[in-house]
Design a protein with these regions (language model features):
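Hydrophobic side chains within alpha-helical segments
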Residues: 110-112, 182, 289
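C-terminal cap/loop subdomain of S1 sulfatases and analogous C-terminal strand-loop tails that border
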Residues: 5, 134-140, 176-181, 186-261, ...
Length: 310
C-alpha cells in the first residue's frame, strides 16, 4: 500500500495477507500473552500454571474424546507444542490464552492496513474480507487439532466490510470458501473463470438475499478411510465416522439451534441419532448425506450406504 501511494497508482488492486497465527506453535508476544495470563509453555513433562486471566474452559470441553474419530493419532492431536497429549484444565486454558494473544496480534496488523487505507482515501472504496481456512479444537470435545467436523473446526470466521454492506449486519446463511472468488468477481464486475465452482454471495452482502446455499457438505478423509463426513441443512447436522476395518463406526445428529456447542452424552446431552423420536430426521439427513456424496463425486461410501460400484 505504501508503494501504491508513492507511485500514485490508481489501478484496482487485490492484496492477500496470510497470517500463520493462531496456528501452532502459538508463540504470542509477551505483552499480549500477559493480557490472558498465558505463557509460551515449553515444558513437555509438566503442565503450565493456572492463572485467573486465562480464558475459561469451553462449554464443550472434555478431557478425552469418547471414541476414535478415525485419525486420533495425527500430529495435531499428540504433538502440538505447549499441550502435546495433555487435556488438563491448565494446559487447555493456557493454550486458549495463547490463541487469543495471537489473534490479538492479527487484529493489530489488520488495524495497520485499515489505517493506511484511510490515510490514502481508499478505505471506503475497498472490500475487506477476514476469514480463515479452518477452526481449531483446543480442548473442545477432548480434541486439539482440526481433523474433525465439529462446528468449532468446520465453521470459520467470515467478516466483510465494503461499499453497499450495512455495518453491523449479520446473516446466518451457509457459504463455502470457494464462493469467495465468484463473489469478488461479481463485486468487481468481471467474469468468473470457467473453472470456478463457487457461487457469488454478493446478494447476501448487499441485503438482497439471506442465503445462497441450503446445504453444506463436509469431509475429512486424512486418516482411516472412509473417514468422516458431515451434512448440514438449517439447524440440523449429521456427522458420520467409519474406518475401513469397521473398528470406528459412529453417527451423531445435532440440532444446532438447541445444542449450538454440539454437547455429547459425556456432557449430559443425548445423541439424537440414538433417539427414536428423531428416527425420521436421521433417515432424512442420511439420505441428504448420500445425495451430496453422489453429487460431489465422493469416492468413498459408508457401510450403511449403497456401494454405487465404487
Amino acid at each position: 500500500l505504501g508503494e501504491r501511494e508513492a507511485t500514485k497508482d490508481t489501478v484496482p488492486f487485490l492484496i492477500y495477507y496470510g497470517f500463520s497465527h493462531p496456528h501452532d506453535t502459538r508463540d504470542g508476544k509477551p505483552e499480549l500473552l500477559a493480557k490472558y495470563g498465558a505463557t509460551n509453555h515449553t515444558d513437555e513433562a509438566n503442565p503450565p500454571s493456572l492463572h485467573s486471566l486465562q480464558p475459561p474452559l469451553p462449554a464443550n470441553y472434555l478431557a478425552k474424546h469418547p471414541f476414535d474419530t478415525t485419525d486420533s493419532g495425527v500430529r495435531d492431536e499428540v504433538a502440538v507444542s505447549g499441550v502435546w497429549q495433555r487435556r488438563d484444565e491448565a494446559s487447555i486454558r493456557n493454550e486458549i490464552g495463547r490463541q487469543y494473544a495471537c489473534s490479538d496480534n492479527i487484529d493489530i496488523q489488520i488495524g495497520r492496513v485499515l489505517k493506511k487505507l484511510e490515510e490514502t482515501g481508499e478505505l471506503d472504496n475497498t472490500y475487506i474480507i477476514y476469514t480463515a481456512d479452518h477452526g481449531m479444537s483446543i480442548g473442545r470435545h477432548g480434541l486439539m487439532g482440526k481433523q474433525n467436523l465439529y462446528q468449532h473446526t468446520w465453521r470459520v470466521p467470515f467478516i466483510v466490510k465494503g461499499p453497499g454492506i450495512q455495518p453491523g449486519s449479520r446473516v446466518e446463511g451457509n457459504i463455502y470458501l470457494l464462493d469467495v472468488l465468484a463473489t469478488l468477481c461479481d463485486l468487481a464486475g468481471i467474469t468468473t473463470p470457467e473453472t470456478n465452482e463457487g457461487t457469488s454471495f454478493k446478494p447476501v452482502l448487499t441485503g438482497e438475499k439471506k442465503i445462497i446455499r441450503d446445504v453444506l457438505y463436509g469431509t475429512y478423509a486424512g486418516g482411516a478411510k472412509p473417514g468422516m463426513r458431515a451434512v448440514k441443512q438449517g439447524d440440523w447436522k449429521l456427522i458420520q465416522y467409519e474406518s475401513a476395518d469397521g473398528s470406528a463406526k459412529h453417527t451423531q445428529l445435532f440440532n444446532l439451534a438447541e445444542n449450538p456447542h454440539e454437547l455429547l452424552p459425556e456432557h449430559g446431552r443425548p445423541n439424537l441419532a440414538d433417539d427414536p423420536k428423531h428416527a425420521d430426521k436421521l433417515k432424512e439427513m442420511q439420505a441428504l448425506l448420500l445425495a451430496e456424496m453422489r453429487r460431489l463425486d465422493d469416492p468413498w461410501r459408508f457401510s450403511n450406504q449403497p456401494g454405487d460400484d465404487l
